[in-house]
Amino acid sequence: MNSISELQKKIRNASQLRITSSADDTDDQLLNMSSYSGVVEYFPEELVITLKAGTSIKEARVVLEKNSQAFSFYVNDSEKTIGSIFATSGSELSDSVLGIQIINGKGDLLNFGGQVMKNVAGYDVSRLLVGSLGKLAVITQISFKVLPEQVVNRLDLKEVKSRTESPIKSEIDKKLKSVFDPYGVFI
């Protein structure tokens, strides 16, 4: 799948196509997004990058590092794709998502969110779909806010609770806990 129109056609013509994650045990036809990769747009001065779902973390990091920037969430396996990280993550990643492009079950191409930090367009579908395992729609593109590398490097990644938890969220949680619960009463 190298184009949106190919993906839309495949979804429209599918009878046994079921959107699944690689963790599902099924005989249904899987939709492999790995060939649909690359940077759609990158605005280093705005701290925003839009990536196709099949783009590997490694490939995205190479682009970001050229401008001394990094994702604000932690990913242990750099071979995973942006789409798979999006589909299997939780709220840690959703804090970084600005917008998405999806194909719904009818084959319609839909855009949600945008490329700005503040979005007041109603329901935040882009964040709702984080962790949905790709079962609600085919995620084709994702826009992320990124941070300067020096900000991310100052965070203590050893304290990150899960593979995909945001180091920034972890650091903020740790500091808030020290202020609001200095004696460790609440677990």
Predicted regions and their residues:
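Conserved glycine-rich FAD pyrophosphate-binding loop
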Residues: S15-Q16, N32-Y36, R61, S68-K80, ...
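Short conserved micro-motifs on helix faces and helix-strand junctions that flank
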Residues: L51, G131, S178-V179
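FAD-binding subdomain of flavoenzyme oxidoreductases
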Residues: I57, K66-K158, F186
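Short, surface-exposed beta-edge/turn micro-motifs
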Residues: D28, E46, V97, K135, ...
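A short glycine-/small-residue-rich loop at the edge of a beta-strand within enzyme catalytic domains
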Residues: L51, V116, P167
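Glycine-rich N-terminal segment of FAD-binding domains in flavoprotein oxidoreductases
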Residues: M1-F73
